[in-house]
Amino acid sequence: MVKVYIAGPIPEVGLNLLKDQGFEVDMYEGTGIIDKETLKQGVKDADALISLLSTSVDKEVIDAANNLKIITNYGAGFNNVDIDYARQQNIDVTNTPKASTNSTAELTFALVLAVARRIPEGDKLCRTTGFDGWAPLFFRGREVSGKTIGIIGLGEIGSAVARRAKAFDMNILYTGPHQKVDKEREIGAKYVDLETLLKNADFVTINAAYNPSLHHQIDKAQFEMMKPTSYLINASRGPIVHEKALVQALKDKEIEGAALDVFEFEPEINDELKTLDNVVITPHIGNATFESRDMMSKIVANDTISKLNNDQPKFIVN
């Protein structure tokens, strides 16, 4: 019988698609991230592995699999999988693009508004000490309308963020490896280099897909370029930002605030970040909506089914 191993719970809609094919489906149901030995045992006789974004699928795991034909990664990113080694072993690797676009863009913009208008701070105040009533100088934040947003990575998610920024009457700058003239026409965005973006943006959002060349792309030197009234928002990948440099920039008031959905050493969160009132933090929930997660479940199931039925998976990345 064809065997599918899943490295953690996924929405029922995908499981049902796999079971309807008559596949033997085994799913890790422990708490937290699956450990390597359990994963190696799980893939030993599996024909397919559905990995999660938090699942490290390295050479050791791949070598433990005797029959593996496909790794379907439940997430738009796939830096958790050694795709080059998988290719050498003739194993397809797929991801779930587009399913996360709207949900992650919505969270990105929610973070923009939350940090600019100090919403979590206000919520905490109301729940603890309370406040003395309305006053002209009390609890002021920043408006986003008329401000400049600088988007690092104008892919699917970055473009969706830009469309939301346009609705808020923001000026839009973007940077990335390539200029995208069609997007510029659609959104009214302007292509600039990273330094120009950092020097001019009031809100810098990171929406680039991670690769090793982007490690610590935002470091001490980059924070020094930013406006003292600017904000950094990261809903992409934690290691793009040097967290120690971010903490120092916030303490030194080189920037006004930050909002983070991802962290450099995730799931660990820098203790100093937790102490700063001008930082909004969320637990990597960029695509954590019922709609997005169900769609991702369908995508990994359908690509798994395609491969195991000798058809071409739709979203191969290697």
UniProtKB/Swiss-Prot annotation:
CDD domains reported for this sequence: 2-Hacid_dh_13
Gene3D superfamilies in alphabetical order: NAD(P)-binding Rossmann-like Domain
EC number: 1.1.1.-
Stored InterPro entries: D-2-hydroxyacid_DH, D-isomer_2_OHA_DH_cat_dom, D-isomer_DH_NAD-bd, NAD(P)-bd_dom_sf
Positions of the catalytic residues: R237, E266, H284
Any GO molecular function: oxidoreductase activity, acting on the CH-OH group of donors, NAD or NADP as acceptor
UniProt signal peptide: none
A Pfam short name: 2-Hacid_dh
Enzyme class: oxidoreductase
Record keywords: NAD, Oxidoreductase
Positions of NAD(+) binding: E156, I157, A235, S236, R237, D261, H284, I285, G286, N287
UniProt-listed PANTHER family: D-ISOMER SPECIFIC 2-HYDROXYACID DEHYDROGENASE FAMILY PROTEIN (AFU_ORTHOLOGUE AFUA_6G10090)
Name used for this protein in its record: Putative 2-hydroxyacid dehydrogenase SSP0606
Species in which this protein is naturally found: Staphylococcus saprophyticus subsp. saprophyticus (strain ATCC 15305 / DSM 20229 / NCIMB 8711 / NCTC 7292 / S-41)
